[in-house]
Structures are given as structure tokens and as C-alpha cells.
Amino acid sequence: MKKNQFLKESDVTAESVFFMKRRQVLKALGISAAAFSLPHAAHADLLSWFKGNDRPPAPAGKPLEFSKPAAWQNNLPLTPADKVSGYNNFYEFGLDKADPAANAGSLKTDPWTLKISGEVAKPLTLDHDDLTRRFPLEERIYRMRCVEAWSMVVPWIGFPLHKLLALAEPTSNAKYVAFETIYAPEQMPGQQDRFIGGGLKYPYVEGLRLDEAMHPLTLMTVGVYGKALPPQNGAPVRLIVPWKYGFKGIKSIVSIKLTRERPPTTWNLVAPDEYGFYANVNPHVDHPRWSQATERFIGSGGILDVQRQPTLLFNGYADQVASLYRGLDLRENF
């Protein structure tokens, strides 16, 4: 497997970000209440810069046993653990980047049931222990690119989705894979209150073409930084598709269903002109409200010191995945 393009040491997310008092900075910058009328995705990052000093701790899940295949151990500098666990989009726990870390402790992840059904010869049901014991786990250092034009580099731990799907034996009718997050309003305040949850229709759903799901890069992820996923990162199991925008990485999955038809996906239902089904990272296809040509890392000096770098086609994984889309108009099928 070819090496991915490297990032500079200076581009790494630093150890501190949530250090400025929101009210003080908003006042200093003259940001008025009108800013809050912007669509959420356009201002969510801005507001998250102005958190206090109550940063959540790094992941504290149980240690996992895993290998480190050389193909996935590259020279990409890692985003610090406290940023991966403390700067998240998980609207089931609130809209602000720090809300998931603050609120996701209410999610009960054991016991857990994950069902694989639909166009398969052998439907499966996995429990919590199966997720970490049934398949050999490996650490993979992947880029993570949010549609909001920020990015991280994360050492995920998991197993290839194709190994799980192979056990279920997809039928010849299977063309797509549909994923569904747990629906538990009593544990997830955003599912209970539309204001907290951004007005989305829950449970959160996502989907892939079958060939995308079977690609070796597509990872069923159960850990990060050597330990089990914390709830705010999608415990106990989430999807990572590194060449796609982060909203494709559905969290806290309870259902995987193979289908004949393309499944609905949450953000595409909300705004089909802004969030496509494919959601491949592409610097040449802008979001209607912002450019995707560059991306930003959360810097150490605050909002005025953010460092930007060019966005890579397919998030730097073009050598591995571009053939999946041969002949497909990437502007039309965004």
C-alpha cells in the first residue's frame, strides 16, 4: 500500500484550545447576536473556540489488545488525544463541539447489540464483547476530514468492515449497506429535544455502496489511542471511512442492513443540495456556504492562529479509492 502524503509538524493540533472565555471574546470581536442566525454548520466551529478551561480528559476506556500493521503506521503526526475526545460533532448530545464530552456519559454501551440483516444469507447479531474479541483488532492512523473544513489525524482501532460482512454472506441482490445509530432518547438529550439535537430526525442513519463498504480502508472502529472508544466518539462501535467527510462516520451503531436500493442518509435528507450521499472529500467541490479547497487544524494560539493546508482529493487516499468512482461525475455525485 502506498504511503499517504505527510503533514508538517507545525500543522498538528496542539494541546490547548478551549482557553478563551466566550463572552469576553465575543465582546472583544464585536460578534453580535445576528451571528447566531447563521446555519449551524457555518458557526459551530467559531463558537467552540470560546470555551473555558474545563477541557474534558483524554479517553479513559479499557485498554485493548491490537496489532500495528506497518501499512497503517505512517508518519502523519497525531492530533492530541484530548482534542479527539473533546472536539466532536455528535448532535445526539448537543450542538457545540464540547457538548458530547460533557453529556455522553449518559450513554450505556454495555450491554450492546449490533444486528446485521437484509440481503444476507446468514444474519448476525453481535454483543458488546464480540465487537472487541471476534475479529483481530488493528491500529490504523487515518486522516479525519470534517465537512466543516477542519481536520485531525487519529489512531483508530478496529477491524475492516468487509470481514464482518463476509460472515453474513451478502446475496447477489445486495448493492448498498445501511447503518443506524441507537435510538435512546432517555440517554441522548438531542434525540429527546429538537433544539438540543439540531432538529434532525433520529435515529441517525447513513449508507454506503457495497463496494465502498467492502473496501479495505473502511473500518469498524471500537477504540482510539489504545483504549475503547469513549461515548462522545461513538462507543462502542462506529464507522470510519477515511476518504469521506466525517458525517459519514456514523456512531454508536446498532444496525447494519444490506439493501437493494440506496438507503436514506440523515444529512442528505436535511439538505440534499449541501450534503450528498457520496460525501467524498474533494477540494474542487465546495459546500454551498464555504470553500472546501483548504482545511484547518485547531492551533495552539487561538482563533487568530489557525493554520490552513490544502485539502487533498479523497483526503489523501486517492491512490487506494479513486478506481471506485471511475466514470462517475464527482461534481454531480458529491
UniProtKB/Swiss-Prot annotation:
Reaction equations catalysed: L-methionyl-[protein] + a quinone + H2O = L-methionyl-(S)-S-oxide-[protein] + a quinol; L-methionyl-[protein] + a quinone + H2O = L-methionyl-(R)-S-oxide-[protein] + a quinol
PANTHER family, sorted: PROTEIN-METHIONINE-SULFOXIDE REDUCTASE, PROTEIN-METHIONINE-SULFOXIDE REDUCTASE CATALYTIC SUBUNIT MSRP
Keywords, alphabetical: Metal-binding, Molybdenum, Oxidoreductase, Periplasm, Signal
InterPro entries: MsrP, OxRdtase_Mopterin-bd_dom, OxRdtase_Mopterin-bd_sf, TAT_signal
Molecular function (Gene Ontology), one example: oxidoreductase activity, acting on a sulfur group of donors, quinone or similar compound as acceptor
Cross-referenced HAMAP family: MsrP
Domain of life where this protein originates: Bacteria
Leader sequence segment: 1-44
Required cofactor names: Mo-molybdopterin
Record-given protein name: Protein-methionine-sulfoxide reductase catalytic subunit MsrP
Main location: periplasm
GO cellular component, one term: periplasmic space
Annotated positions binding Mo-molybdopterin: N88, Y91, E92, C146, T181, N233, R238, G249, I250, K251
Subcellular locations according to the entry: Periplasm
Keyword presence, Plastid: no
Physiological role: Part of the MsrPQ system that repairs oxidized periplasmic proteins containing methionine sulfoxide residues (Met-O), using respiratory chain electrons. Thus protects these proteins from oxidative-stress damage caused by reactive species of oxygen and chlorine generated by the host defense mechanisms. MsrPQ is essential for the maintenance of envelope integrity under bleach stress, rescuing a wide series of structurally unrelated periplasmic proteins from methionine oxidation, including the primary periplasmic chaperone SurA and the lipoprotein Pal.
SUPFAM superfamilies, A to Z: Oxidoreductase molybdopterin-binding domain (SSF56524)
Assigned protein family: Belongs to the MsrP family.
UniProt modification remark: Predicted to be exported by the Tat system. The position of the signal peptide cleavage has not been experimentally proven.
